[in-house]
């Protein structure tokens, strides 16, 4: 359990995945903000910047790679680690090329998710 709550922004267009990830991460003591759209900028400022972003690669209306490129180009957000997720394991190279620090292939094991999150926090 984290002694100091770290904030994680989870961006995915599947409500079930958002709910699942929020529950798992909150059970581990993290503060979690979720959004189902790529309109991430608004969420970044709700209560301060997150310490980590979990980002689905394919969102309705927005490409996760574009979001990462934008985040990494901005002074205030370029330091925030981004873990991209996709149902296509072959997308890891693309995610890293876009600027993501790490990648999770869906479906993933809870232990794998928590280990990657802990690695960056």
Predicted regions located by residue number:
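Active-site residues of response regulator receiver
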Residues: 56
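Receiver (REC) domain switch/active-site region of two-component response regulators
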Residues: 109
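Hydrophobic residue at a beta-alpha junction
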Residues: 35-36, 59-62, 71
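Two-component/phosphorelay signaling modules centered on CheY-like receiver
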Residues: 15-33
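Hydrophobic/aromatic residues positioned on beta-strands within the core alpha/beta folds
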Residues: 83-85
